[in-house]
C-alpha cells in the first residue's frame, strides 16, 4: 500500500513541477478545486473512469467534453494520464496533495468558511486578512453554507477550527451540563 501511495503522490509532485515551470501555480490550484467540485457533484464519473468496460478513448472523450473549455490543457491531459493508468480512483488524493504542495510552494493555505447563510465576498476577504495576519501566511477561504450552524461562522484552516456559532455554544452548554450532572451525582 505504501508504494502505491508514494506512486500517486509522484503524480502530484510532477504536476507541481509543471505548474511552477509555467508560472501558473495559482491557476492550477483553482482548476484542481473546480475538478474536485465537478466530480464530487457527479459521483457517477468515478464509476465511469475506473470501469474496465469503458474504453480509454471513450474516457478521454468524456474528459475533453467536461473539462477542455474550463481548465488548463495540461490538467485535461493530466486527467487523461491518471485515467489511462487506472488511478482515477485516487484522483482526489492526487489533486489534494497537489494543492497542499502548491500552497506550501506559494507560502499560503486554503480553508473553508462555513456559515448558516450567504455572506459577501467583502466579508470573506476580511476574514482572509485577519487569518493571514494570525497565521503568518496568506489564507484563501472558500465559502460553504452549513445549516447546522443555526447562526454564526466556522472557519477551518490547516486543521484548526475557529468557531463562533449558536451550534457550538449549545454544544458547549450541553457538555457543561453533563459535566455538572456527573459531578453532582458523584457527591
From Swiss-Prot:
GO terms (molecular function) for this protein are: proton-transporting ATP synthase activity, rotational mechanism
Topology in membrane:
Peripheral membrane protein
Q: What is its main location?
A: membrane
Give the residues annotated as coiled coil.
Answer: none
Q: Report if keyword Chloroplast is assigned.
A: no
Location(s), subcellular = Cell membrane
Keywords of the record = ATP synthesis, Cell membrane, CF(1), Hydrogen ion transport, Ion transport, Membrane, Transport
Alphabetized InterPro entries for the sequence = ATP_synth_OSCP/delta_N_sf (IPR026015), ATPase_OSCP/dsu (IPR000711)
GO CC, sorted alphabetically, is: plasma membrane; proton-transporting ATP synthase complex
UniProt keyword Ion transport present: yes
One Pfam family named in its UniProt record: OSCP
Xref: PANTHER family:
ATP SYNTHASE DELTA CHAIN (PTHR11910)
Quaternary structure, per UniProt, is: F-type ATPases have 2 components, F(1) - the catalytic core - and F(0) - the membrane proton channel. F(1) has five subunits: alpha(3), beta(3), gamma(1), delta(1), epsilon(1). F(0) has three main subunits: a(1), b(2) and c(10-14). The alpha and beta chains form an alternating ring which encloses part of the gamma chain. F(1) is attached to F(0) by a central stalk formed by the gamma and epsilon chains, while a peripheral stalk is formed by the delta and b chains.
What family, per the record? Answer: Belongs to the ATPase delta chain family.
This chain's function reads: F(1)F(0) ATP synthase produces ATP from ADP in the presence of a proton or sodium gradient. F-type ATPases consist of two structural domains, F(1) containing the extramembraneous catalytic core and F(0) containing the membrane proton channel, linked together by a central stalk and a peripheral stalk. During catalysis, ATP synthesis in the catalytic domain of F(1) is coupled via a rotary mechanism of the central stalk subunits to proton translocation.
What's this protein's name? ATP synthase subunit delta
Amino acid at each position: 500500500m505504501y508504494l502505491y501511495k508514494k506512486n500517486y503522490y509522484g503524480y502530484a509532485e510532477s504536476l507541481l513541477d509543471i505548474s511552477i515551470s509555467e508560472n501558473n501555480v495559482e491557476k492550477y490550484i483553482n482548476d484542481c478545486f473546480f475538478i474536485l467540485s465537478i466530480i464530487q457533484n457527479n459521483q457517477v464519473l468515478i464509476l465511469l473512469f475506473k470501469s474496465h468496460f469503458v474504453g480509454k478513448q471513450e474516457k478521454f472523450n468524456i474528459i475533453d467534453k467536461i473539462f477542455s473549455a474550463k481548465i488548463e490543457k495540461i490538467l485535461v491531459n493530466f486527467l487523461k494520464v491518471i485515467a489511462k493508468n487506472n488511478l482515477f480512483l485516487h484522483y482526489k488524493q492526487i489533486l489534494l496533495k497537489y494543492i497542499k504542495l502548491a500552497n506550501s510552494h506559494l507560502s499560503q493555505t486554503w480553508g473553508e468558511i462555513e456559515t448558516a447563510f450567504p455572506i459577501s465576498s467583502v466579508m470573506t476577504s476580511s476574514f482572509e486578512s485577519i487569518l493571514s495576519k494570525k497565521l503568518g501566511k496568506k489564507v484563501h477561504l472558500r465559502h460553504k453554507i452549513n445549516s447546522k450552524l443555526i447562526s454564526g461562522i466556522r472557519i477551518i484552516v490547516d486543521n484548526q477550527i475557529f468557531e463562533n456559532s449558536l451550534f457550538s455554544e449549545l454544544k458547549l452548554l450541553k457538555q457543561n451540563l453533563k459535566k455538572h450532572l456527573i459531578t453532582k451525582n458523584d457527591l
